[in-house]
Amino acid sequence: NIKQHNLKKTLKEIILQDYKQVKILEKIIHPFVRKEMKKFSINNQRKKMVFYEIPLLIESNLMKHFDIIIFIKAKKKIRLNRFLDKGGEKKMFNLLNKRQFSDIKKAKFSDHIVVNEKNLNILKKNLSGIISKYV
């Protein structure tokens, strides 16, 4: 969608020019995200399991909304390369990375930790092992 692409591009430009704008953007975006999260939960309440992928879950103090937290981690260099492969810029990666807690701190709030430094098949296998404990 061209409109979404242009919005993302504009937001990136704002963030790169003045990182302090992130706080303002978060105050606008986070209530909407939480509303969508709640709607998703309601629409899926009959399912045995529901999965969310939430950047900055712990940093945003959203842990209380979930029964199980799986922390998927990778070395900074690997995360940077993946970000660049998706068309991201190193400066943006560094700005976003600063917002994250350390792996040690995130691990304290996690029920499971999965290292994601290989390929998607290995990640899926590791996640399947965890999920099978709850089915």
Where is each model-derived feature located?
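ATP-dependent small-molecule kinase phosphotransfer cores
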Residues: N1-R46
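Amphipathic alpha-helical segments within well-ordered protein domains
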Residues: K12-E13, E26, L80, L84, ...
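Residue-level recognition of specific faces of alpha-helices
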Residues: Q21-I24, E53, I68, L95
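Residue-level signature of catalytic and energy-coupling elements of molecular machines
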Residues: L25, F51, V114
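Active-site-adjacent beta-strand anchor residues
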Residues: E26-K27, I72-K73, N116
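Small-molecule kinase domains that catalyze NTP-dependent phosphoryl transfer to phosphate-bearing small molecules
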Residues: V33-M37, K64-H65, K76, K86-V135
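ATP-dependent NMP and nucleoside kinases share a basic, alpha-helical "lid"
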Residues: E36-N43, M49-D85
